[in-house]
Amino acid sequence: YFFEKDMADHAIKWMRTQQAAAPDKPFFMYYAPGIAHTPHHAPKDWLDKFKGKFDQGWDKLREETFVRQKRMGIIPANSQLSPRPAALPAWDSLSADQKKLYARLMEAYAASVSYSDFQTGRLIDAIRETGELDNTLIVYIQGDNGSSAEGGPEGLLYEQSTITGRKETMAEKMAHIDDIGGPKLYNHFPAAWAWAMNSPFPWWKQVASQAGGVRNGMVVSWPKRITDKGAFRSQYAHVSDIAPTVLEAVGIKSPEVVKGVPQKPVDGISLGYTFQQGAAPSARRMQIYEMMENFGIYKDGWMAGTLPKRAAWEAGAAGDRKLTVGPDQREWSLFNLDTDFTTAKDLAKKDPAKLKEMQDLFWAEAAKNNILPIHDYSQGTQGRPSLGAYRTSFTYRPGAATIAEDAAPHTIGKSFRIDADVTAGSSTKGVMIAQGGRFGGYSFYLKDGKPVFHYNAVGADNFTVAADSALADGKHTLSAEFAADKAAPGTPGTLTLYVDGKAVGSGRLGRTVAGWLSHTEGLDIGLDRISAVSPDYSVQDSAFTGQISEVRVSIK
């Protein structure tokens, strides 16, 4: 199963159904694929298409892209290419195994993106079949930020390794090289590929203060209205400009009141003026950016922004993430985009007066646009609303499904106990409670009538504790109690199983998750949805075959 294909199938079906019901009525579709977010998955035949395509490495690929962009007229002929950041290794410095592994991770990325683009092409072909393609406005945005460097210098078999505090070894990665791009892994390429993908700009996703974190290509097609086909436009634009562009094209205004509620004014500026006026000055003169304490401001051709305070792969990492540099102590850069499209020449030291002007503008606009106060999540969560962080007791009954991690018991770095009141026997199987999935989590279930607790700390770090004997038929309270060795994220500890208060099994959990259990799956009662925490069962056969009265979780 691939989501991108399924989404395209549904989009095409919806469009055809709508046209069958009302062929003269226009339609609006917002189509947002999950790619190129991790995991980078694709069918095997698509993975095979890209074997050997990136053996030249990231330095050469970035240069090749830069030369091609110049030749095509996408960037100015006098553009300069910024150097590789010191935190990233040169391709030529890598070992043979590193090159083989890293190239394969990039092949999986390319295959996943190409497969997703193919599905978008199917959707456009379906519009063409209706005869309305020339009269259809299509806005194709390349991405929502810069390419992701969150795979770190060495890439990842599991993106969760970073957020759970797990270190992947080179030997482990090489042992799984043939699984890259498939369902067993949650793979992400090394950060240097992200740097190459962001050519000609420096930096990457998260760094909203720099061009590599915010600039993306965009294609607008509307053959009936746009006569300058294949031409480039360089006016400064922001994603908030898309909605006003669509509204102007349709000929309607954004409502000022919806169901009696006054609406905030639309920030965007229609890009319709660029359709026929290639040389028109940019209607958007100013834009503010902020993400994870990366501050940026654009004004009339000038771009000022902070330099990253930490690497992208450190931002979501488990462990101590306290900042040592405050918002007022950040180092800033300054670029004149009119003469330096690729932001290769930092003018911050040469023009401190202009930099100060831009910094003052940032703080003024931040106050106007509800960006203040700026509080990085690494500075702590005290005072933030949470449905689960401040609770120590949780009670669930059958039917509770996919409860978000923040609302579920916060077990990271803590001792905890699970008690399940059930009616079961020697033939009962299935999940009583599960949180997370294949790439991190825990599950308490019955297998052949025996209580089992499985803790999935990602990859090879899986731990199972099982009772020796099956249950007698009847009502029971089944318990799993984890005694942490210490109150710290990632702590090992001892897991003990109980049946009606009597210990029936015990074992060590060599490590626990240090960050999030799962950033994609929640807590389930009575079955395990989306993906299975334990290899002992599948999602399809995870349903509890006995009866559950309630499940209680207590945090100690």
Regions found by a protein language model. Give the residues of each.
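Active-site regions of oxyanion-processing enzymes, predominantly non-cytosolic
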Residues: 4-83, 112, 116, 121, ...
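Substrate-binding rim/cap in mid-to-C-terminal beta-strand-loop elements of soluble/periplasmic
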Residues: 52, 124-125, 160-281, 451, ...
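Active-site rim elements
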Residues: 1-2, 54-56, 105-111, 204-207, ...
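Extracellular glycan-associated modules
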Residues: 373-556
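Short, solvent-exposed loop/turn and secondary-structure capping segments
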Residues: 25, 30, 38-47, 80-81, ...
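Core domains of carbohydrate- and sulfate-ester-processing enzymes
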Residues: 40-42, 47-94, 148-216, 304-321, ...
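Structural recognition of the beta-strand scaffold that forms the well-ordered cores
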Residues: 27-32, 137-141, 200-202, 218-221, ...
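C-terminal, low-complexity/hydrophilic appendages and adjacent surface loops
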Residues: 196-216, 289-350, 354
